[in-house]
C-alpha cells in the first residue's frame, strides 16, 4: 500500500483504491470501466439514495433483521450522504451498468465506511450484508429514480411553472385593452387582444402543471420489495411498505410499494410517461418563447407590438442592438428536454424480461429536464415576461392596415363582397374602412359599429347590437 492508494478486495480480486476514498473495490472498478462522459448523478438522486438507505436500515432494525447499534450507524451514515456531505465520493459516470448496480454499490460502500467509523468492531458494517440488506440494485435504483424525480417535480418544476403562469396572467390583465392583429399561418387574421394572447400562454402553463402533476402521481408506486427479479427473494414481506412509509414522511410526498413488481422492474413506463409530460411542457414553452420573440421583433422592420426588457448588449459589432436572449435560452432548454424525452422513450423500450437496463441514463435525462425547465421558466418569468411593455400605437398602426378586418362585414355584405374589399385594401395599401366608404357598401352611420375592432375580439357579429 502506498501513501496515495490502498488495496481493497472483492470477488474478482485486489483493486488499488485512492487512499482517501470512502468507496471500495466495486466502485473503483466502475471508475476504471466507465470513463465516458464525466457526467455524474446529481444531488437529487444521491439524496434519494441516501434517504432510502436510511429508511431501510431503520426498518430492518424494526423487523429484527439488524442490530440496533448497526442499524443506527447505517442510518446516521446514510443521512450524511443524503444531506450532501459526501458527494465527492460518488464519482461514477451515468453511462455504466444499465441497472445502476455500480452506483448502488458506490452508496453501499460509502455508507459502510462511514458507519464503521462510528460503530464498534463487534458491530462491523458490511456494504452488502447490512447496508444493502433486503435490497437489490434492481429495485433500489428504480425506486431512487421515482423518489428523486417526484421530489424534483414538487420542489422545483411545479412551483416554477406556477410562477411563470402568474407572470403571464398579470400581463394578460395589463394588456387586455390593447386590440391588435391576430395572425394565423404567420399571416394577418382577425383582431385579437394582446391580453388574450398572454392569457392563452398562461393557460398553457397551467395545463403543463397539471400534466406533470399527473405524471408524477405515476411515480408514487415504487419497485422496492421486488429485489432481484420482482419475486421479493431475501426481503421481508413488510420491508418495502414500512421503508416507503418512512421515505414518504421524510419528503412529505406519497410513496407506496408497487402492485406488481414485475411491471415495476421490467418496465419503466411511468418514466416514459413523465418524459412525455415534460416534452409537452417544453413544446408549450417553445411556442410561448417564440411568439414573444416575434411580437418583439424589430424595432423598425419587425412586428414590434411589444418591447422586451434589455438584459444585455446583443451584438459585438452592431452598436445598440438588443436581442431576445431570454427567449432564446428558453428555446434551447426546450430543445434539450425534447431530446431527453427521446432518450427516455428509447430507454423505456429496453426493459428486457425482468429488468430495464438503461435506468441510469433515464434518471439523468429526467432529472436534467426537470431542473432545466424549472430554472428556465423562473428566469424567463422574472427577466423577460415581468418586464414586457406593450406598444399600443404600433399595434393600432398594423391593425388599421389589416385586410382581415373585412371578415366582420360578412354578415352585412356577404363573403364575396368582403373578399373584394379585403383584396382591394391589401393591394392598394389602404384601410378596409376607406375601401368600404369609397364603394358605398355600408351606410356611414353603421360603419363604426360594423368595424368596431374591440367587438371583433368577442363572440358574436360586430355591430349587430
Sequence positions of predicted segments:
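Conserved, well-structured ligand/cofactor-binding cores
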Residues: 1-465
